[in-house]
Amino acid sequence: MHNMYTREQYLALCKDIEEDDYRYYVLHDPIISDYDYDMKMQKLLSIEAQHPEWRVLWSPSMRLGDRISGSFPVVTHSHPMLSIANAYTLEELNDFFSRVEKTLGYTPTYTLELKIDGIAVAIRYEQRVLVQALSRGNGRQGEDITTNIRTIRSLPLRLPKEAPEFLEVRGEVFFTRATFEQINSIQRQSEKPEFANPRNAAGGTLKLLSAKEAAQRNLELSIYGAWAEENTESHYDNLMLCQKWGFPVFGRPRQYKSVEEVVKALHEIAKIRDQLPMEIDGVVIKVDNTEDQKVLGMTAKHYRWALAYKYAPEQGETILEDILIQVGRTGVLTPVAKLRPVFLSGSKVSRASLYNEEEIERKDIRIGDTVYVEKGGEIIPKVVGVCLEKRPEGTKPWVMPEYCPVCHERVSRESDKVSVRCTNSSCSAGTIEKIRFFVGREALDIEHLGEKVITKLFDLGLIHRRCDIFQITEEDLLQVPGFKDKSIKNVLKSIEKAKSAPLERFIAALGIPYVGIGGANALAQHFLSLDAVMSASLEELKVIDGIGSKVAESIVDYFHQSDNVEEIQKMLSLGVNVLPYSRASASCQGKTFVITGSLEKMTRSEAEASIRNCGGKVGSSVSKSINYLVVGKDPGSKLKKAQELQIPILNESDLLKILYPN
């Protein structure tokens, strides 16, 4: 009986499991079987259930995770988490060395660490027990992510007696390549969107409201700095002490006595970069002596004693075997490169983006060419150039097909001469894409209805258009291979939930050409109801901020098509309740945003209009007075300036969460 245990025996069991965790997750040298470990953990949980008052903050059960309240409080950092300046060339590197040596008057010892591509965190210990963990945030304040950080098995929840009573460590939270592949495999099996890269996956995991789910993903941590009342005068020695106290240090810190040694090490690390278990995007160079660091000091933006040397995105060379055509939900034909498989960043690449016909013409890409492929943090790599010296004889310029590869109807060319579209409303490819988009995360967000399920239901003749989703029955789902009682109940529950749709989400889900989520929100805020949107005139639409003539014409055209109106009416008759827009949201009130780069889910004007509609302002240049920089693809110099000024950086997904918190 567990009620026979004393508190001393409970604490001894905690310490025993703590040692097992250290041997397994840090030393990778377990001395007990998984079964024996599980039995110990079950015993611990049982004792804590009998005596909840005994549970200590460093109990191994804290790693299993509880549900988080629903928000992450913002807390001020004890020391600012400044950024590190970047260098991409040897010239920039030498400038850094010259500045350091000119200030100090001699060549210092440098410590090099792998720049792991992850999420920076600060973790605080009091009385040698982990009490708080914060994200980097804007460098001055971060979000309290303690509950999810505790799920990292390699991180000690309690420190040994030789460690300082009060200690703060800084580190990078990340996923190994292998774990990242496992996570995306699970995402694919669940028909959920894959993560673009390990860094995005780590960031998303730290923000999960279920720490139990976070624990299942196996986050890793690598410490790169420590603050205590009595630090040694060597940064390298401090890291070695952290390692001795049980902290994981995966950055492979090494000391070098000369600039020549540092440069040689950078070249050597570049050679083994792809063989490392985790993604790195460079190497951090630090002046090792902490007194020298104080002399060098810092700017408002970054430390003067550290520099991040960034490697260029990895490129591969392979053969372009074919150019395939994908048909999207609006009928747009998109060319995709079929490649002879090539390994990039540790994974096999056989498909790459070609964007559109104009891009293919500009780069003169032909089938049979030897092409350069680059993987720069996206799921789908891109073809960046052609090796003309290796072009085979007889190749011909590629031209967009005149007929849809799916329904074989003639395609039409848009007035912008870039988009080529299949206008056949019955085309199966476009129909499936429309349905998939309709139920997707950025639209009605109907869980458990992924692309494979949609395609199977379509192939079985159970759905033909979007409104059919709301008529799916248990008998229909039983015909889908692999579906069981629990899965069927989950799908039907999600469909029922989606019947109460906020106006802006419903409009976005319709997939009106040129109307993204930003435009949908602008329409909802202006007209407040679905009826008003559907009956709006061209003149009424044109006056809305963010809705230009082209978008207005597309909206009017969409609601003048009888098929579209009939389908919406059918949805309403099936119980769909489109909720009127509420003006209560002012999520951007008093905030100033600047946007750089191209956005994917909405146009620049839609994003700006949405920010203004939520009470925010949109600036044109980066300065200390702005609150956020929103970064899309191919950002300009604004990104570098914002990083120097420590202005919070948002990607498009971050912006959408602010604009549409529900």
Curated annotation (Swiss-Prot):
UniProt keyword terms in alphabetical order: DNA damage, DNA repair, DNA replication, Ligase, Magnesium, Manganese, Metal-binding, NAD, Zinc
Domain of life: Bacteria
Binding-site residues, Zn(2+): 404, 407, 422, 427
GO cellular component, as recorded: cytosol
The reaction(s) this protein catalyses: NAD(+) + (deoxyribonucleotide)n-3'-hydroxyl + 5'-phospho-(deoxyribonucleotide)m = (deoxyribonucleotide)n+m + AMP + beta-nicotinamide D-nucleotide
Functional note: DNA ligase that catalyzes the formation of phosphodiester linkages between 5'-phosphoryl and 3'-hydroxyl groups in double-stranded DNA using NAD as a coenzyme and as the energy source for the reaction. It is essential for DNA replication and repair of damaged DNA.
Entry's EC annotation: 6.5.1.2
Entries under Pfam families matching the protein: BRCT, DNA_ligase_aden, DNA_ligase_OB, DNA_ligase_ZBD, HHH_2
Protein name as annotated: DNA ligase
Domain BRCT: 583-662
